[in-house]
Amino acid sequence: RAAEEARTLQGEYREGTTRGHEGWEAIVKPEPMGTVLCITPYNYPLSTTALEVAPALAAGNSVILKPASKTPVSAAILADVVSELDLPDGAFNFVPGRGSTIGDLLVGDGRVNTITMTGSSGAGKHVARKSGMVNLHMELGGNAPAVVFPDADLSEVAGACTKGSLKYAGQRCSAV
């Protein structure tokens, strides 16, 4: 039976590019995941939100956008823009509120098939525990290192690191 199934595989064939797997092929068949919960951060409230919402909608999913409670206005403006699109009713849902109340309800709802989240490692662990381990896509707790080579001008390095760490009040994963 499995051999027969191989004859009916549909999708796009892509050659593997991972070292050690050259020449291997993968079959990619894009399919909607269902309902995608997008939990977005406060430090990049518009760009990260758009990067989570747009692909989910484009792939045919229903989206629930739960922005950071500290910075919901950018997401609300994006929600207004999305409301102008010709989407089916219920395809996009904007749900602001505190993570400890609204977020926990959404994360634990069995109708959510996938959760995409950008935030702290602690919040990510909490979401993973509450979600029942549905499909998770997370970018958590980034701390960009500063690699300093022996021949670097230390005065220039110190200035660049200080400047980077103070941008956005240091609240970005690529601060240094």
Named regions from a protein language model:
Residues 3-10, 82, 86, 110, ...:
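Structural signal for hydrophobic packing residues in well-ordered secondary-structure cores
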Residues 1-50, 87, 92:
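N-terminal Rossmann NAD(P)-binding subdomain characteristic of aldehyde/semialdehyde dehydrogenases
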Residues 30, 47-50, 69-72, 76, ...:
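Glycine-rich phosphate-binding loop at the start of an alpha helix
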Residues 39, 66-68, 95-97, 117-120, ...:
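Generic beta-strand/beta-sheet core signal
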Residues 89-123:
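Active-site phosphate-binding strand-loop segment of PLP-dependent enzymes
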Residues 114, 122-176:
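ALDH superfamily catalytic-core signature
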Residues 49-103:
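PLP-dependent aminotransferase-like
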